């Protein structure tokens, strides 16, 4: 089954017929050059698809990166002046169709003869992810969410209504426009906003897309059994294998190269990228292009303008939109044609797009018993620890923290544990530290975290000073892609009329998929390469669980904490339920409803 895309000569597909097929070499590819702006996951994926499926010579592919390291938001470093730094983590699942299509071909750096996908698959089979404590309250006590969503019937109906709403009816609407306290006061909303970092003022459209995209994982939402994680941080587990693959293919990495604009010749609806303006180590220069040169640009960035603190300094600094960087580049491109999107919709209000994370590294054994009491696992076992975030339900910062398999860094001291902490509310005073998170040093953030672990108050300061080191990172635009939007605010991957230019990443438009995922980056890269180069192979469509009645039935029962949707009070319509159900007696519909626990004894 195939469905035509709005991308030149490309289409979506599903099933393994095309998944296992190799496309022929596109005509004329040896005469082309590709310039990729940025070296984050989307950019590296585009380069990999050019090599693997486009069969472009590696020496014809040029990656232009402003920094001196690849990876973009997929970072993970040891800074000798600060400590270990992870700005975020990557939650993945089995139906990231484009991501796994790519990583089946990227050799593992850890297991000889295996792919990154092989390594990841074996790891998560042998050490499956699940949480034993999803949330705490009263300073480290289990909040006993117990896998329940605690939604009222009215709350369930609000979610159902959003689920059924057309995209265009949600343009520029916020979550607050479609939900009320029936949802916001539920455990469902605690799970949802802490796991995905949604705020009440974010896009109702994106909320709906998330719900539809991951409907098959509703049952795994309370305990994170739906999730899978890499062995190490995302830089070492995902970025480095891709970089090695590309270097082996002869791809050129040009670091310290800041692209400031792409100049277009636009005539009669035809858009041709003619030049790239850039600075190489601060010196202005340019690249002249022909129609045979392909340009791929990652527009916007969730980690642009990150401000770093350390143990004794808060991440203070200018968090305004920079005159340089990804946002400025997109703005310069967007000025040339409306088809290139509206970056100001996403980067103009950092009070609504920021949050702060911190990496806490333990230095001895003193904090570990408090961690182990909550997660009920040995943090230094090398296996799953928290199994996803633990949210401090009554935290003023809405603090959450997680410990993935240790060490999170390949060269990490085996006696140390790296903890990732983040707070959704950065501008309100804490519960132990009486000032906003954004004004806190690393030590003070550790103190607030220790308070919510249940450490005795008279020990907190000493442990934060001597038993841990913390690196806070303030990210002004981390949820910029969640801001309310309308059609055209995000440009198409290949904007209408573009001959040799495509956008990549989280701020492009592609149907049905959801931002803030590794899959979105890789999907847009695949669509861009296949569309511009004419790769004759289908792009895997977004997993179609939203169209699978079995998944819809299962998720409905789960969302209602085990009650059947048929048990809902429909008022005057209650009297017709039994007669209508009698019509399906003895049919495959009855069997389907019984198999998925919707139809129960006594209902017919």
Q: What is each of the regions a protein language model found here?
A:
Residues 109-216, 228-229:
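Rossmann-like flavin
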Residues 215-230, 292-294, 299-524, 530-544:
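C-terminal segments that line or cap access tunnels to active or ligand-binding sites in enzymes
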Residues 81-122:
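Conserved FAD-binding subdomain of flavin-dependent enzymes
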Residues 26-42, 62:
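Beta1/beta-strand and adjacent pyrophosphate-binding region of the FAD-binding site
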Residues 2-7:
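Short, small-residue-biased leader/transition segments that mark boundaries at the very start
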């Amino acid at each position: 089954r195939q469905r035509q895309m709005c991308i030149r000569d490309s289409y979506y597909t599903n099933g393994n017929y095309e998944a296992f097929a190799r496309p022929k070499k596109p005509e004329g590819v040896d005469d082309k050059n590709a310039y990729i702006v940025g070296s984050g996951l989307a950019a590296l994926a585009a380069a990999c698809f050019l090599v693997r499926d486009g069969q472009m010579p590696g020496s014809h592919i040029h990656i232009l990166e402003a920094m001196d390291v690849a990876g973009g938001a997929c970072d993970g470093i040891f800074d000798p002046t600060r400590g270990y730094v992870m700005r975020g983590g990557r939650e993945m699942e089995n139906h990231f169709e484009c991501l796994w299509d790519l990583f089946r071909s990227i050799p593992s750096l850890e297991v000889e003869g295996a792919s990154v996908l092989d390594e990841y698959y074996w790891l998560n089979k042998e050490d499956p992810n699940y949480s034993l404590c999803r949330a705490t309250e009263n300073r480290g006590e289990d909040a006993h969410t117990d896998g329940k969503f605690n939604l009222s019937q009215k709350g369930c109906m609000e979610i159902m209504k959003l689920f059924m709403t057309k995209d265009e009816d949600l343009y520029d609407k916020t979550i607050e426009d479609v939900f009320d306290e029936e949802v916001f006061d539920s455990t469902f909303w605690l799970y949802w906003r802490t796991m995905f970092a949604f705020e009440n003022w974010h896009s109702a459209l994106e909320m709906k897309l998330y719900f539809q995209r991951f409907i098959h994982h509703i049952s795994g939402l309370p305990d994170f059994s739906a999730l899978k994680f890499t062995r190490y941080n995302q830089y070492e587990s995902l970025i480095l294998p891709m970089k090695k693959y590309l270097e082996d293919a002869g791809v050129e990495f040009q670091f310290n190269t800041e692209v400031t604009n792409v100049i277009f010749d636009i005539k009669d609806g035809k858009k041709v990228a003619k030049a790239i303006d850039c600075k190489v180590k601060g010196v202005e220069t340019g690249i002249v292009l022909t129609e045979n040169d392909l340009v791929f640009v990652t527009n916007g960035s969730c980690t642009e303008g990150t401000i770093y603190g350390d143990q004794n300094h808060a991440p203070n600094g200018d968090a305004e939109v920079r005159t340089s960087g990804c946002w400025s580049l997109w703005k310069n491109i967007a000025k040339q044609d409306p088809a290139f999107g509206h970056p100001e919709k996403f980067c103009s209000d950092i009070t609504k797009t920021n949050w702060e994370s911190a990496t806490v590294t333990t230095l001895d054994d003193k904090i570990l018993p408090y961690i182990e009491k909550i997660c009920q696992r040995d943090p230094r076992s090398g296996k799953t620890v928290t199994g996803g975030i633990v949210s401090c339900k009554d935290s003023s910062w809405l603090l959450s923290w997680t410990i993935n398999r240790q060490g999170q860094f390949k060269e990490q001291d085996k006696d140390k544990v790296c903890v990732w902490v983040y707070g959704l509310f950065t501008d309100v005073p804490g519960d132990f530290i009486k000032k906003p998170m954004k004004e806190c040093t690393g030590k003070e953030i550790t103190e607030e975290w220790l308070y919510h672990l249940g450490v005795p108050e008279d020990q907190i300061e000493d442990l934060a000073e001597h038993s841990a080191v913390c690196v806070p990172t303030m990210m002004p635009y981390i949820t910029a892609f969640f801001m309310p939007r309308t059609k055209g605010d995000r440009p198409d991957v290949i904007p209408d009329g573009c001959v040799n230019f495509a956008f990549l990443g989280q701020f492009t438009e592609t149907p049905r998929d959801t931002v803030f995922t590794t899959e979105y980056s890789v999907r847009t890269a695949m669509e861009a390469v296949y569309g511009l180069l004419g790769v004759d192979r289908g792009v895997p469509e977004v997993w179609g669980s939203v169209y699978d009645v079995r998944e819809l039935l299962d998720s409905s029962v789960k969302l209602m904490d085990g009650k059947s949707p048929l048990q809902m009070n429909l008022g005057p319509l209650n009297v017709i339920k039994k007669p209508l159900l009698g019509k399906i007696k003895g049919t495959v519909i009855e069997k389907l409803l019984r198999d998925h626990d919707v139809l129960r004894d006594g209902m017919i």
